[in-house]
């Protein structure tokens, strides 16, 4: 019995006397290279996406009537997943037209399912946002155009 106690005591001393490793430093800084790879911040103004909209001309002056209509549709159909000014379930629409073409935005709104199957940027966003599917809201071109005008007003 005394040998067991002595063995236990010696074991404790041996393990306590070994040199301690310096604690690792943790850094919470966001690495710039990682953020540049994210689809939500990647800029591609040439990609028009897949869908019915192949060309759109935006007037220089924002149409305030269309903005109000787009805001109402956005609040009704989109705010479950998208928040103004912050990432939520889906990306924030702020500055979207600095990163995507108007055609791409409208095709994503109008033709969500096919965009997620065939458009590389839409696929990358799908992966970035943990595989959350954007629900096809079955909007028409006029409604999508109103939402686009609302997005222009957010810039």
Question: Which residues does each predicted region cover?
Answer:
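Sec-dependent bacterial lipoprotein signal peptides
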Residues: 1-15
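C-terminal capping alpha-helices of c-type cytochrome domains
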Residues: 103-108, 131-155
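Electrostatic cytochrome c docking/interface patches
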Residues: 30-73
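The canonical Cys-X-X-Cys-His
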Residues: 70, 74-85, 105, 134, ...
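Intrinsically disordered, low-complexity segments enriched in small/polar and acidic residues
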Residues: 25-29
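Gly/Gly-Pro-rich "capping" loops immediately C-terminal to redox-active cysteine motifs
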Residues: 71, 83-111
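Axial heme c-ligation environment in periplasmic c-type cytochrome domains
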Residues: 89-96, 114-143
């Amino acid at each position: 019995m005394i040998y067991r106690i002595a063995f236990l005591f010696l074991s404790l001393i041996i393990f306590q006397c070994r040199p301690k490793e310096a604690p690792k430093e943790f850094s919470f800084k966001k690495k710039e290279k990682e953020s540049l790879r994210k689809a939500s911040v990647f800029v591609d103004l040439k990609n028009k996406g897949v869908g019915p909209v192949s060309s759109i001309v935006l007037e220089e002056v924002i149409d305030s009537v269309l903005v109000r209509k787009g805001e109402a549709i956005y609040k009704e159909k989109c705010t479950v997943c998208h928040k103004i000014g912050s990432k939520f379930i889906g990306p924030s629409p702020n500055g979207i037209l600095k990163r995507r073409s108007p055609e791409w935005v409208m095709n994503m709104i109008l033709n969500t399912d096919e965009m997620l199957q065939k458009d590389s940027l839409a696929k990358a966003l799908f992966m970035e946002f943990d595989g959350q599917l954007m629900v096809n809201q079955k909007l028409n071109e006029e409604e999508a155009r109103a939402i686009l005008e609302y997005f222009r007003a957010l810039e």
